[in-house]
């Protein structure tokens, strides 16, 4: 209940700011959806980069009892793990979400996290868009009662959608933690694109009725 109170009190403001288009490939032979999926990855990483540039090292690594003793760095490293693992698997092979390291330099050093983010942006910008349609197997431990992991068929594009949505939810938690520490979180940070769209439509409808 304490965390839920913090979520209510300190959630970052939801501003109807559209996610900017950061990257547009000149390859017009790939589906428009592939262009948009790649743009969503780049925009999400750029949001993280902006946040890291605005907070201090101490705020990045501070562990908060109200957030299960987690840190912004821990949540952010977790997001980058998914984008990095997916990028590597997109080029060749299958994807295993369980193959991640915890307590790394990215989690404990803000500048290392900034550099890792920028490297990922470059990697995703160079990705051949046709790869997003590639089918592969995804492994992740989802069952508490078993010792093994579970595997399912998927596609790179489908996992891009998951990685972005996953990051947005962790960004929301990061926003809560930043609010607890009194930080000014960028407007729209941790707000889902569908939520921003809904807010825009609601505001437009309210304006039209006045």
Predicted regions and their residues:
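Polybasic, lysine-rich low-complexity intrinsically disordered segments
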Residues: 5-6
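Short hydrophobic alpha-helical segments enriched in small aliphatic residues
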Residues: 9-11
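Short, Lys/Arg-enriched N-terminal segments with co-localized hydrophobic residues
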Residues: 13-27
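Short, helix-capping/interhelical loops that line the mouth of catalytic, cofactor-
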Residues: 27-32, 81-126, 132-148, 183-210
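Alpha-helical transition-metal enzyme core signature, strongest for iron centers
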Residues: 41-48, 72-86, 110-124, 163-174
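Helix-loop segments that flank and shape redox-cofactor active sites
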Residues: 47-71, 87-105, 147-153
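Short conserved catalytic/interaction loops centered on acidic-Pro-aromatic/His motifs
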Residues: 171-189
């Amino acid at each position: 209940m304490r965390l839920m109170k913090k979520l209510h009190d300190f959630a970052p403001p939801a501003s109807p700011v559209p996610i900017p288009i950061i990257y547009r490939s000149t390859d017009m032979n790939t589906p428009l959806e592939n262009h948009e999926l790649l743009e969503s990855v780049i925009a999400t990483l750029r949001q993280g980069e902006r946040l890291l540039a605005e907070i201090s090292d101490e705020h990045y690594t501070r562990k908060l009892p109200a957030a299960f003793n987690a840190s912004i760095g821990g949540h952010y490293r977790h997001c980058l793990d998914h984008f990095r693992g997916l990028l590597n698997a997109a080029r060749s092979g299958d994807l295993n979400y369980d193959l991640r390291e915890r307590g790394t330099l990215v989690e404990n050093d803000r500048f290392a996290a900034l550099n890792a983010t920028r490297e990922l942006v470059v990697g995703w910008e160079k990705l051949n868009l046709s790869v997003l349609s590639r089918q592969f197997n995804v492994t992740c431990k989802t069952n508490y009662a078993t010792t093994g992991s579970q595997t399912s068929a998927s596609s790179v594009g489908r996992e891009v959608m998951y990685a972005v949505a996953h990051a947005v939810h962790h960004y929301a938690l990061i926003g809560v933690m930043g609010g607890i520490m009194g930080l000014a979180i960028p407007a729209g940070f941790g707000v889902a694109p569908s939520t921003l769209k809904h807010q825009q439509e609601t505001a437009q409808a309210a304006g039209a009725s006045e």
